[in-house]
Amino acid sequence: MEPVLWRVLEVSGDKTALMLSEKILDGGVSFNPDYSNTDPYYCWWSESQIRKFLNGKEYVGSVSADVTKITVRNPKTYSFYEKAFSAGEGSGIIKADVDNSSTRGAAPGPKTTDKIFLLSYADAKNTAYGFVNNENSDPSRKAELTGYGASQGVISNTEGNKKYGYWWLRSPGNSVG
């Protein structure tokens, strides 16, 4: 396993940091499997398979689950949190209150508390994090695949001898294209 290189996006006054892996480490987990479902909560981070996969035993179901009637399952036999971090490393990761505001008119999802989470639409356009403030292609949003990530079915494209993968955002919204 290759070491993980982290990009520090923000350091808070309480010495906590928001970090992003420079490479795509794993894949093959969809946001939610039923893309044909038109209920607004099907695009909520709080009810997503990928949230459960990322947080594993640390996953706490959303209060909204009573309304949505969704049973969230992790489609893999392991979670990212338990596989990527040792017990010591995991104890250093604190839970964060996660804002799940929407974009492009979709219904916003409820706030969650998570140790591992995807960036939001606003995060991916935040110039303080080193991104450009638009939806155009931006080299700072490119993420190269690890060998393991590539083996997990991440959708990718090749430039030269490098494979770059696409990554999810947690913000509910309509697709661009």
Q: Where would I find each of the regions flagged by the language model?
A:
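Collagenous Gly-X-Y triple-helix signature in extracellular proteins
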Residues: 1-177
